[in-house]
Amino acid sequence: MSSTPVNVTVTGAAGQIGYALLFRIASGQLLGADTPVRLRLLEIPQAVRAAEGTALELEDSAFPLLAGVDVFDDAKRAFEGTNVALLVGARPRTKGMERGDLLSANGGIFKPQGEAINSGAAEDIRVLVVGNPANTNALIAQTHAPDVPAERFTAMTRLDHNRAIAQLAKKLGVPSAEIRKITIWGNHSATQYPDIFHAQVGGRSGAEAVGDQKWIAEEFIPRVAKRGAEIIEVRGASSAASAASAAIDHVYTWVNGTPEGDWTSAAIPSDGSYGVPEGLISSFPVTAAGGKFEIVQGLELDAFSREKIDASVRELAEEREAVRALGLI
């Protein structure tokens, strides 16, 4: 076991996702069963007391890997010496709110957090943005951390990836473990493109195994893209445990690598691959090794896939222009 704890900062720590996330981190599921962690919980002042209550519960769980818990309402202090940052807290869209208002409100959160990460985080900092709009929030934070390599900022599409695996497995009547090489392209929004044309199921492509293009276009893609809204409708609250689980998966894969013969999905700064403008934080098929994500290259895209990817990338470019116009990047 490593003797030096890894500092993990979680923002929005008193929220539902934070509550579902923190106990799994403390149990070793984020980084591995031999890596101790010190948790740093960041909240807005009015939620600090609730976060302190969660800290008490974490202490009471007596996790062998938990080296300590600290609660902050100041970003500079919360990110000091941090190795892994999970940016969960964000301003949700409320009824009647325009997209510009949403982006502006979140800019007020992610700009100072990016600055705090830039000034105080550890040299090996890795950042995962969970709070929506995740891709553009990640872009805002990354822009304000110019001394941190851009590749250290990612946004979460692993929840969409996991949802796509689950839907395909359900359709084919196979365990989720048999599904490999699913891809989520583009934005973590309703325009995302869940791609099963390169997926593998028992030696066949996902699309070939399904054998029903109408189901793919009219049921599978919309069901995955709009699953969050479906859960709100059924549960009466947004998905929290599944989002926390996906965040765990994302960071664990980033640190420990993807299995041989498989890849995952993550929103990372584009290097121009697949025609996605450089610098946009877009979801790609990625492998992880040595603590770095790499975009899977050389995948052939048919006209259907190209159109879907381009539509989502257009939305990302529009969001980038909107935050640029607001002076946030």
From Swiss-Prot:
Residue positions of the active site: 188 (proton acceptor)
Reaction catalysis annotation: (S)-malate + NAD(+) = oxaloacetate + NADH + H(+)
InterPro entries: L-lactate/malate_DH (IPR001557), Lactate/malate_DH_C (IPR022383), Lactate/malate_DH_N (IPR001236), Lactate_DH/Glyco_Ohase_4_C (IPR015955), Malate_DH_AS (IPR001252), Malate_DH_type2 (IPR010945), NAD(P)-bd_dom_sf (IPR036291)
EC number(s) reported in the record: 1.1.1.37
UniProt entry tagged with the keyword Repeat: no
Superkingdom of the organism of origin: Bacteria
A Gene Ontology BP annotation from the UniProt entry: malate metabolic process
SUPFAM superfamilies, per the entry: LDH C-terminal domain-like, NAD(P)-binding Rossmann-fold domains
Amino acids binding NAD(+): 12-18, 106, 113, 130-132
UniProt-annotated binding residues for substrate: 93, 99, 132, 163
GO molecular function: L-malate dehydrogenase (NAD+) activity
Keywords: NAD, Oxidoreductase, Tricarboxylic acid cycle
Coiled coil: none
Family: Belongs to the LDH/MDH superfamily. MDH type 2 family.
Function: Catalyzes the reversible oxidation of malate to oxaloacetate.
Protein name listed in UniProt: Malate dehydrogenase
UniProt source species: Frankia alni (strain DSM 45986 / CECT 9034 / ACN14a)
